[in-house]
């Protein structure tokens, strides 16, 4: 059975982690083995009682200073890019990228020849240049966009 490696940048109680929680809960009930990589705290922590879910977390939060927020974002992308290579020799792995933001693990997944699936929640073309760039990257890296 396919192992799902799921990446979500910021685990809080907003819409995208709540939607992801519903999706992952359905997959967990079907018996899929899921590795969840996300920040500490939030709605996704409610899945931790499933034995077939393993969570890897990192500290991430927003700052009032946009430069600090972007530095933190880039650091998480580098961390998750490197972390992703732990699944290099696993067969039957799908990288599930929740939202546009986790571009580091999506890039690593493509480099390793893994299947990359994006769950696209937001309309990037109303959010600004940064999100438009991320949407373009998603279109190049994704095998499938949900």
Please give the residue ranges for each predicted region.
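A short, glycine/small-residue-rich beta-strand->loop->alpha-helix junction that serves as a flexible
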Residues: 7-22, 125
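Short, well-ordered alpha-helix to beta-strand connector turns
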Residues: 31, 52, 91-92, 113, ...
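Residues at the starts of beta-strands that form the adenosine-phosphate
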Residues: 3, 33-35, 115, 143-144
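A conserved, positively charged/aromatic
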Residues: 117-146
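An aromatic- and histidine-rich active-site surface loop
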Residues: 77-80, 94-112, 127-128
